[in-house]
Amino acid sequence: LFLHDRLLNAAIQGLVDIKKYSETTPGMISFVGLPYEMNGKLYNVVAGIMNGCILGMVPKMYLPNYGEFYERRQFTPGFNECVYVDVDGEEVPFGSELLFTFNNNRKVKIGVEICEDLWTPQPPSIKHAMNGATIIVNASASNETIGKDTYRKQLVSGQSARLVCGYVYSSAGGGESTQDIVFSAHNLICENGSTLAEAHKFADESVYADIDVERICSERRRMSTYAVDENSTYTEVQAQNFINKELELIRYFDKAPFVPSDKKERDSRCEEILNIQSYGLKKRLEHTNCKNAVIGISGGLDSTLALLVTVRAFDLCGFDRSGIHCITMPCFGTTDRTYNNAVKLTKQLGCS
């Protein structure tokens, strides 16, 4: 069907219809996948649409031709160079190296890759991010096999972490009725390794989330190894009047982000913290051949943790706990309760 003029013309008409409808949703950018013919070759592309305009078209770079896939029968791999094509009387940029930017929010830069592009050793999203993209959009048609959903989620989440970006992954659903494979509409939104939203498989449901672009930019500034390409060959397509007003947050921000709410995970995190500190102290004790430690304790949280870490380190070294000397240091904030806690803790741990 991809080779039939009727389907190709209908796809263009559908794109034009969506373009016209976008005039009624000002400030919202949409990405639509379609087959597109250029110079006698057929490309698998995604078009960016906003405010009644087709902003650009990005071709798929990697075409799978293994297993249940045979895209090379019909399609031609995309290219990096930006050329211009006529779509409904508009001159539209076409090429892989496109970034969608906005005149009133320069931190939002969107790069596009398509399905298999993400599953390759060198996904285009790497270049997109190294050229400034803070959000990656992937319009996909990823079929279902046993266990593939778990791998897919790990792939999307991992890529968002590796690139320090937001990753919006939209996959085909039950509407693909003419295929000999099954699609589940496994839609995902991830940010820097965290999954913000995930659709239930086979539910054909939409997902949405708040992506913290300012956090992404802040994290990238902190990373001295995250260097943006200074000799960029990318074309930035600037859209006008991106939504830039305060909206009600739909994202939940944990008041204690470093303390897991799940007890099992919280216990594991606490054990990890204790081990990191204890093994660090163990190394220092062995290096200095020191078998004594002096700790000021008050019965409060900080000194209690310091004591527990020291006890664990002494046990790891095989040292006698009597070498840990606990000194109470009462002050204006000390109460009978905290003082007694400090004394009891010292005795029960077998310290001096």
Predicted regions and their residues:
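Enzyme catalytic cores with a strong preference for nitrogen-chemistry domains
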Residues: 1-296, 307-308, 312-321, 348
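ATP-dependent adenylation/pyrophosphate-handling site
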Residues: 293-297, 301-343
